[in-house]
């Protein structure tokens, strides 16, 4: 018989496979490493197209694609209480001990954390983003975050800059916030066996083509670099609203033969695109931590990036050239990168990345956060309401009303369907037997 799981963790976010991005990769790789450490991990996300219901992924990772459809930017419509029945069922079925929510943008994450705390579960939140304080959208989002984190057990941020930002936005105690960086799968992102010729210098851009990722900067930077360096070409991977602007720039400056537009690039093809280049260009206007930079560095590319958010913390100074988010400064940074390109050794850079970043290390550090969360004392409803009341003169009262109603609905659900009536799901330990994955329960029959 296999040993019972150490912890039973529910990862919750609107962002997961088959969608691709930094948050999606983080949840997937962290879950896989936690499974290898002996924990049970279940993921809850919304349905993607016809992908709905329960699915199993590599290593026995169980994913609940709940029948909620994305509303805008891959997030579900905020129902506040609509997700309570299904969250309660999953928590009981999987015998969850820790609920781990990801990303401040995720509606599903905020609602699941609220319901989990109402039911007395330990909750952890990871913030993958940076937010401002001045515009209307940021003010609204910061208030939502303050509500979600008022009753949190522990929080994780992916950089020191992100930690400071989250503490300021949410009013959370810094003692409750841990800094655990992202990582990269260095086994997947390796340099090319034969380095591309430097006769033609290829600059690679892989990013969502949106304002926040600095697509407007690319429109100004690319023509100027092409004018200064006839032997430079660009490969741009990604899609988004700003794709049209880049196409117009290419037409306007007659750069069709020097700027290749790939469109959306699946994560499985990212490495094959990266190894065709010499320099990786990141033009983000705000970034808590950029996994794309790690992937490029692991493939042996020299990075040029904007000096924003947590980006300066990601790589050593000799592996990245930083610039202000200004077209002229970025052009100067690219010129500097081209001049030091002959000194770059891709294999040496890859080996350094293997030592600097590891998902196994991220998982072990996350384990410590889970242990800290489990040691936090359970608070009564009155104590929890006092926390929400301190969130503001009007907002505090509103938050208290929301939580009281959530508590009453949970009690009503317990009357309509007692906890004992929710069937517990069996633990399935996938192991390899003659090249086939089988459940622990079938192992004896096979033998």
From Swiss-Prot:
Expression across tissues: Expressed in roots, stems, leaves, flowers and pollen grains.
Major localization class: endoplasmic reticulum
GO cellular component: glycosylphosphatidylinositol-N-acetylglucosaminyltransferase (GPI-GnT) complex
Catalytic activity: a 1,2-diacyl-sn-glycero-3-phospho-(1D-myo-inositol) + UDP-N-acetyl-alpha-D-glucosamine = a 6-(N-acetyl-alpha-D-glucosaminyl)-1-(1,2-diacyl-sn-glycero-3-phospho)-1D-myo-inositol + UDP + H(+)
Principal EC category: transferase
Example GO BP: GPI anchor biosynthetic process
Disruption phenotype: Defective in pollen germination and pollen tube growth.
InterPro entries the record matches: Glyco_trans_1, PIG-A/GPI3, PIGA_GPI_anchor_biosynthesis
CDD domains xref list: GT4_PIG-A-like
Compartments reported by the entry: Endoplasmic reticulum membrane
UniProt pathway: Glycolipid biosynthesis; glycosylphosphatidylinositol-anchor biosynthesis
Pfam family name, one: PIGA
Protein's job: Necessary for the synthesis of N-acetylglucosaminyl-phosphatidylinositol, the very early intermediate in GPI-anchor biosynthesis. Required for pollen germination and pollen tube growth.
UniProt protein name: Phosphatidylinositol N-acetylglucosaminyltransferase subunit A
Organism of provenance: Arabidopsis thaliana (Mouse-ear cress)
GN (gene name): PIGA
């Amino acid at each position: 018989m296999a040993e019972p799981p150490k912890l039973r963790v529910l990862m919750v976010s609107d962002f997961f496979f088959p969608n691709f991005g930094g948050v999606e990769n983080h949840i997937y790789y962290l879950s896989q490493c936690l499974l290898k450490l002996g924990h049970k991990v279940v993921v809850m996300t919304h349905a993607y197209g016809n992908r709905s219901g329960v699915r199993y992924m590599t290593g026995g990772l169980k994913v609940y694609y709940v029948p909620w459809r994305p509303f805008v930017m891959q997030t579900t419509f905020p129902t506040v209480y609509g997700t309570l029945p299904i969250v309660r069922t999953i928590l009981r079925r999987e015998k969850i001990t820790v609920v781990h929510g990801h990303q401040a943008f995720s509606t599903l994450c905020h609602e699941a954390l609220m319901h989990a705390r109402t039911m007395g579960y330990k909750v952890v939140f990871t913030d993958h983003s940076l937010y401002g304080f001045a515009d209307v959208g940021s003010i609204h989002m910061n208030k939502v975050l303050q509500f979600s984190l008022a009753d949190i057990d522990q929080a994780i941020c992916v950089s020191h800059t992100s930690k400071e930002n989250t503490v300021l936005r949410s009013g959370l105690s810094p003692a409750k916030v841990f800094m655990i960086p992202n990582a990269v799968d260095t086994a997947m992102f390796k340099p090319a066996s034969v380095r591309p010729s430097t006769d033609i210098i290829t600059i690679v851009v892989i990013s969502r083509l949106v304002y926040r990722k600095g697509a407007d900067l690319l429109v100004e930077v690319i023509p100027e670099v092409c004018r200064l360096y006839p032997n430079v070409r660009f490969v741009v991977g990604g899609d988004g609203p700003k794709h049209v602007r880049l196409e117009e720039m290419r037409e306007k400056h007659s750069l069709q033969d020097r700027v290749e537009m790939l469109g959306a690039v699946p994560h499985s093809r990212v490495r094959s695109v990266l190894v065709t280049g010499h320099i990786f260009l990141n033009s983000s206007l705000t970034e808590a931590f950029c996994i794309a930079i790690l992937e490029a560095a692991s493939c042996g590319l020299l990075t040029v990036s904007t000096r924003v958010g947590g980006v300066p913390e990601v790589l050593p100074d000799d592996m990245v050239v930083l610039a202000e988010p200004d077209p002229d400064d970025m052009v100067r940074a690219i010129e500097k990168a081209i001049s030091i390109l002959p000194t770059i050794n891709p294999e040496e850079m890859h080996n350094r990345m293997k030592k600097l970043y590891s998902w196994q290390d991220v998982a072990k550090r996350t384990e410590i956060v889970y242990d800290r969360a489990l040691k936090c004392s359970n608070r009564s409803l009155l104590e929890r309401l006092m926390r929400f009341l301190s969130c503001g003169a009007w907002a505090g009262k509103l938050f208290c009303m929301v939580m009281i109603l959530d508590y009453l609905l949970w009690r009503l659900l317990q009357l309509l369907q007692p906890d004992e009536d929710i069937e517990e799901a069996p633990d399935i330990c996938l192991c390899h037997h003659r090249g086939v994955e089988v459940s622990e329960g079938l192992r004896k029959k096979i033998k």
